[in-house]
Amino acid sequence: MTPPFCWYYPPLQEGILCRRYQRFFAEIELTSGDRVTAHCPNTGPMTGICQVGAPVQVSYHADPKRKLAYTWEMIFVDGTWVGVNTSLPNRVIASALAAGILPELAGYGTQQREVAYGQERSRIDFYLTDHPQEPPAYVEVKNTTWAQGGLALFPDTVTSRGQKHLRELQRLRQTQPETRVCMLYFINRGDCDRFAPGDSADPTYGQLLRAAYNQGVEILPYRFAIEPRGIQFLGTAKLLL
């Protein structure tokens, strides 16, 4: 049975990646032969997926207020489409939560976004309430694109912000043991069925993730298939710690 789509892209245009530069820009040659500058909505290193000459898909926006009309949405590497637009995962998760298709998080009647929590008043991506049986849940979302042979890895570089989030989630778990605290990894490619911390990129993050898990923070590595039509939820990846 083919998994249902939980997100649909607008009409996309195909091209090839000529280069990515200054983090926010990508030069794309469309199939029409036109070369355009597209916004790159991913400020990270894009380890393993930023391959010159690879097929890409871009969206077009005719808004005169935009500096760039095109946005780079995905790239085809290692036989699979990989999502590039880091603004999408939270929107996809919101849609999937509303549809009740995420097994560990199904059944919550209310979702709130960017809710302040903890001593530092950081903002959690989702705060879920009104479940008939489960306690409220705090859910932080991380976009994951780095992979090695079917193993999804996060992070792909040192992330002090990510380390901070894990420390805050551990404190949240300690101070509010009556609630659920979840770290959700959005695996933005359909060819991975396992997930592990990217220890070679950021060993401190890996140590913190294992410590958080041991303290009761739930680790939810969710698999998604990306294609030009839309995004499908494939289930939960095997967690390797």
Curated annotation (Swiss-Prot):
InterPro entries on file: SfsA, SfsA_C, SfsA_N
Record CDD domains: SfsA-like_bacterial
GO molecular function, one term: DNA binding
Disulfides per UniProt: none
Domain of life: Bacteria
Family from the record: Belongs to the SfsA family.
Name the record gives this protein: Sugar fermentation stimulation protein homolog
Gene: sfsA
